[in-house]
Amino acid sequence: MDKAKRNIKPFDGEKYAIWKFRIRALLAEQDVLKVVDGLMPNEVDDSWKKAERCAKSTIIEYLSDSFLNFATSDITARQILENLDAVYERKSLASQLALRKRLLSLKLSSEMSLLSHFHIFDELISELLAAGAKIEEMDKISHLLITLPSCYDGIITAIETLSEENLTLAFVKNRLLDQEIKIKNDHNDTSKKVMNAIVHNNNNTYKNNLFKNRVTKPKKIFKGNSKYKVKCHHCGREGHIKKDCFHYKRILNNKNKENEKQVQTATSHGIAFMVKEVNNTSVMDNCGFVLDSGASDHLINDESLYTDSVEVVPPLKIAVAKQGEFIYATKRGIVRLRNDHEITLEDVLFCKEAAGNLMSVKRLQEAGMSIEFDKSGVTISKNGLMVVKNSGMLNNVPVINFQAYSINAKHKNNFRLWHERFGHISDGKLLEIKRKNMFSDQSLLNNLELSCEICEPCLNGKQARLPFKQLKDKTHIKRPLFVVHSDVCGPITPVTLDDKNYFVIFVDQFTHYCVTYLIKYKSDVFSMFQDFVAKSEAHFNLKVVYLYIDNGREYLSNEMRQFCVKKGISYHLTVPHTPQLNGVSERMIRTITEKARTMVSGAKLDKSFWGEAVLTATYLINRIPSRALVDSSKTPYEMWHNKKPYLKHLRVFGATVYVHIKNKQGKFDDKSFKSIFVGYEPNGFKLWDAVNEKFIVARDVVVDETNMVNSRAVKFETVFLKDSKESENKNFPNDSRKIIQTEFPNESKECDNIQFLKDSKESENKNFPNDSRKIIQTEFPNESKECDNIQFLKDSKESNKYFLNESKKRKRDDHLNESKGSGNPNESRESETAEHLKEIGIDNPTKNDGIEIINRRSERLKTKPQISYNEEDNSLNKVVLNAHTIFNDVPNSFDEIQYRDDKSSWEEAINTELNAHKINNTWTITKRPENKNIVDSRWVFSVKYNELGNPIRYKARLVARGFTQKYQIDYEETFAPVARISSFRFILSLVIQYNLKVHQMDVKTAFLNGTLKEEIYMRLPQGISCNSDNVCKLNKAIYGLKQAARCWFEVFEQALKECEFVNSSVDRCIYILDKGNINENIYVLLYVDDVVIATGDMTRMNNFKRYLMEKFRMTDLNEIKHFIGIRIEMQEDKIYLSQSAYVKKILSKFNMENCNAVSTPLPSKINYELLNSDEDCNTPCRSLIGCLMYIMLCTRPDLTTAVNILSRYSSKNNSELWQNLKRVLRYLKGTIDMKLIFKKNLAFENKIIGYVDSDWAGSEIDRKSTTGYLFKMFDFNLICWNTKRQNSVAASSTEAEYMALFEAVREALWLKFLLTSINIKLENPIKIYEDNQGCISIANNPSCHKRAKHIDIKYHFAREQVQNNVICLEYIPTENQLADIFTKPLPAARFVELRDKLGLLQDDQSNAE
């Protein structure tokens, strides 16, 4: 059989499953299927080779040319199919979800035959099965029946009555095809009449031109002796139709003149077409328009479609074709419609008697549109772009369905819409609400019908495990407040916009009414309970009797107990670890969180809006029926307030809201601005103004529930508004964290609009105010209980990207306006700002930096300065550990001091420095020698901070400009060691494990103690009055000299050696005075001029400190609290290390202090191509990377992977890099109080243990792997960690793990030598956990494996240490591998799990310990 007869289309990337099925059938026919299904035999004979050639040739024959790269010459037929499978056989969950969505949205249209519909349906089912989905026969039948329109309801009902055992898909299809024939026969027997009357247009020229291209001679439709005979609807004879009937044409010609006169009496733009009878309502609804080529005006029969209209006085009389009949147009206006694109119709007439809507071809052409008729219908286009394509035909007349942008159009009672308005309520609850009379305006729900549509936000927010059997509640409560349940949920990250971490609920068991408060700390529970008891007891005039709670400490405080005793409230505590005993509150919290999570997901808002979602969820839950109530026909709200709630004001969470601006506006200023609906208040909607970053409460609004917010659009960036043109800045005060209530106008008592619950008895939010959210209220005029001015948009063309786009556009417009002229009143203030930016190290303003400097609101400029950072001053070439000094607001020069408010403090610091030099005899003033290099000098200023980040001392340092020194004349050796930060953590680990004391001393002017070997002359410093020919001959070292640090280190080391201290062989800045006992030994760590001393003998400690103070000018800081920017909190058996003050400064510096927190530093999927792009956005990426690296090296190992990955692209400086860096800041925002914990472990098994892992080929750019390892002391204290991209590409995961092991072994040996150097011995080999069995095998086995023969020799160093019993490798499952966090970005749950195991805990967690 040749290729043509087989009818197999060459594969071109489409329908791979069908193509593969046919190819396999062909290979089976050729008896060569075994070569693609079976394994190749050890001995390949000629028959196998022949079958292989045949199979490969067949597959290649049915591949299109563009896909031949899958079939290279050196691969087999089986490998070709495997390569194609890898690309086109999609069996992922995402593929299945996309196909299921298509299947659920599939509907049979009126133009499509049932056989074509079956074909599309079967293709989708086949694709689903190919994607790995399991679909039962009944599922296929159910999906098929769902796709059918209402005309098949009868046969569907009949099918539903059949037994499932007798039902097959083929049987159902057969019955449906029979039904299709019946429907078509019924349709032909009762042909619909579309046009009842024809009115001729008086504009005959237009009509003649319009029909010029039409065939005037009637076509002969039926040829031969056709069995099918047509019949004329006019004369009743067979063989022709009405339009070709000569009797009809004669009557039409006779009445032509009379009809034209009737049109002229009605209007000069007479209606040429009138629909009087339309029976096919499935095609044309209220927003359907018949396209009429003879009409001279548009006409509608529903005035709610108008967006703007005027009365026609007197009414316009319009004659129809039937003699003696007239209709009247009473309005004329504008209608906005949308099909694929928006179209606006002007001068549209409204006639109530019309049975349908008409769209005039003439009016469309006058508006510049072109209309093309073809067999499928009609296409309307403008300027070559398609605007509308008709979606249906009605008796060969084009009918176009639209959605109307009508402010007055009533909302359709859509099941999905009310589902979202009720906060994604369950379908059963919504139907129960419809059945029972629970609301004052219950009629709004009369037309609800159950929808089969799947709600994806509900799945994202609510999907859970199947329930367990519940015990029946046998408690019989007779009144409210008899039993109250309470529980706390949290901490929740990110924090809310007003910095809340928890929420607490109080549930009354009798009414099932819930009150929710947002709180920052668990200790706030008591004040919230007081508020609840006071308000609820006053409401009912009853007492709370029982309080059901768990054993949380927030409920067991002394003040809580005393309050309950005073009020006569009895505690009922649950058994520990048995939350089922407090099931009411546990279930309520679950319901609230699921509903809130779903609303945030559905609204596409940032997670920091969870607090508003929780309050809104509570508000809605109180208005939803509960099975826990004795009377299930009532809601908790009605049980609590004794009256029914209202529905009118319910709106979809996260909807776009247009707020009316009440302040006096310019003639052409906007009268509204956009915001986001986030909740309900007693007198209006609670809204988030994203531009001005504040909550507002308003009632004069328009709500667009179809337009949800995109999370990327809501950026909390400061907007510098212009003075008079940004009116909303006047409406609302500058405090972005307060809720501002707008003023309400007087309203009538009876109003048909939406009711806002102002009465204290109508709103639980009024009864129970959230103390943590103070509401600033202006004075209100008298307001009605049931009134509002809210209007609703059913659809909108606007996109929610406005939150960012409008902000950016406003900033651009302001910037352009300022650049047009020089007479800007803000110029002087801008120049002052520019000077201030220079003072803190920022260059002249440039554009597109993406950074904003926030002043205090009262001092903010009205325009946004475009600033950029000096890349030269903020490069990674600076020492990372000095990154914490970049935030000091200090003078940049000696002359600048004269203009500062703190002038006296700096002058005092300068005098102190000069006196120190005088006492120290640092220099001798002499005449300038000839032929000698003179080193320049300058003043450097800084501020020293305590552990809380508060300034404690102003420091002025006179430094030499070392770059003016000459090599081998002014200096030779310059290197000076400094202690590793891991050495500092090593000392702290010893301190906590062996109960040592650790103190700190600060060396004053440390470098001035160094002795110079060279003869150096320096220019006189500013502040000393002397002969200009004089210079300073340096007697001792001074800051800034290249050799100053080395000179100081040599002097300090010599002083310690005089006391018999010995320094470590692996870290020269660690010294030990060995007394044979760890508690009596003295350990010293030197970090430049900071000295850390640890010992268990305080007498030796004090003696040693006195010795140092005799040798050098020093400050005794006693117990260590703050070291190189790290805050140290000492407790009896724990040490906490944190850098919260520094993190806050970073957030402030980069304008991210009000950002939204995220749960991980980086997303689990990173776009490396965008990170590697050459786009230059002029953002301070390098400066930020340096700051993050300092945090990561000191106390935050959770940042290691993120900083390592992003620093690889620090030279790119593109927008993707900047966005990822800002995400790291957002993560820091949510973990400011994160602490690294060291604690005493009496049951430790290993003094040092390690974990090592690698991410094979994780770098998508160069495919190199990433090494990650960590080491702990005493099984808990984390002292070393590292992430590093490997130098070469690994051929396998085993090789990548082996290369990572090499790096870990080197670090382990360093720790071993460090312990040995301070006389602490290791009894056992250092244990390193590895999760790759192949790597362990290579390290343990000295024989050469095939897969390891190419590995570089240096990596076998790890094997040598294993053989020497220095290192012991032990396998660990991947799920327990702690080093996994150092190899790649992880999902949030896995990341948090490993972060906790590293010993990183936040404040509340550390307190719980």
Curated annotation (Swiss-Prot):
Keywords carried by this UniProt record: Aspartyl protease, ATP-binding, Hydrolase, Metal-binding, Nucleotide-binding, Protease, Transposable element, Zinc, Zinc-finger
Ranges annotated as CCHC-type zinc finger: 230-247
UniProt keyword annotation of Lipid metabolism present: no
Active-site residues from the entry: 292 (for protease activity)
GO CC, one annotated term: DNA polymerase complex
Cross-referenced InterPro entries: DNA/RNA_pol_sf (IPR043502), GAG-pre-integrase_dom (IPR025724), Integrase_cat-core (IPR001584), PolX-like_BBD (IPR054722), Retrotran_Ty1/copia-like (IPR039537), RNaseH-like_sf (IPR012337), RNaseH_sf (IPR036397), RVT_2 (IPR013103)
Class of this enzyme: hydrolase
Composition-biased stretches (Basic and acidic residues): 827-841
Alphabetical GO biological process terms: DNA biosynthetic process; DNA integration; proteolysis
Limits of the Integrase catalytic domain: 476-644
Region (Disordered): 760-780, 805-851
Keyword hit for Ligase: no
Highest taxon of source: Eukaryota
Name assigned to this protein: Copia protein
